[in-house]
């Protein structure tokens, strides 16, 4: 029995469908980030199981309203444990959210309707409920590390229903 032919995608021909992550230019790489800022939330790892838990506590450099780093060019110097994604890490990290465009592209999947490269609008990531806007309670500098467990939330690891739609709701 032969495999069913792959259904054509309306995104075929775009750079994220024609190149591997390793082949992307720096500009293309950066444009894949949808601006959700979920990766900028503090995470806890269970030492026994390795399971990752998200919190609603942002990195000290996260602007929760803008869903952007306050010092992106210098983030690694200012926050030593800030993860700078690489193609290798995209394929290995288990905590990237299901909506992460880097992960989608690595898996050969299409970007969602709300991704700015598809919608042409950087606000659709917020409209779809994917971003952290309005959901960051505090930053890591305001919460003692021993209290982070009290701030565990599940939503960053989930995809909101409206984000799963095939197109922008009218």
Swiss-Prot record:
Transmembrane segments: none annotated. It comes from the Bacteria. Belongs to the UPF0260 family. This is UPF0260 protein Rpal_2074. It comes from Rhodopseudomonas palustris (strain TIE-1).
């Amino acid at each position: 029995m032969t495999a069913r032919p792959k259904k054509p995608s309306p995104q075929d021909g775009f750079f994220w469908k024609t190149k591997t992550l390793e082949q992307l230019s720096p500009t293309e790489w950066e444009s894949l980030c949808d601006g959700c800022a979920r990766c900028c939330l503090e995470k806890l790892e269970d030492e026994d199981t390795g399971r990752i838990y998200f919190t609603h506590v942002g990195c000290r450099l996260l602007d929760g309203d803008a869903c952007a780093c306050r010092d992106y060019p210098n983030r690694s110097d200012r926050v030593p444990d800030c993860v700078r994604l690489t193609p290798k890490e995209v394929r290995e990290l288990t905590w990237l959210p299901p909506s992460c465009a880097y992960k989608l592209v690595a898996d050969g999947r299409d970007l969602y309707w709300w991704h700015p490269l598809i919608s042409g609008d950087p606000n659709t990531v917020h409209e779809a409920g994917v971003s952290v806007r309005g959901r960051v309670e505090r930053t890591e500098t305001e919460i003692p590390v021993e209290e982070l467990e009290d701030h565990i939330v599940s939503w960053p690891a989930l995809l909101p229903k409206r984000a799963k739609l095939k197109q922008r709701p009218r």
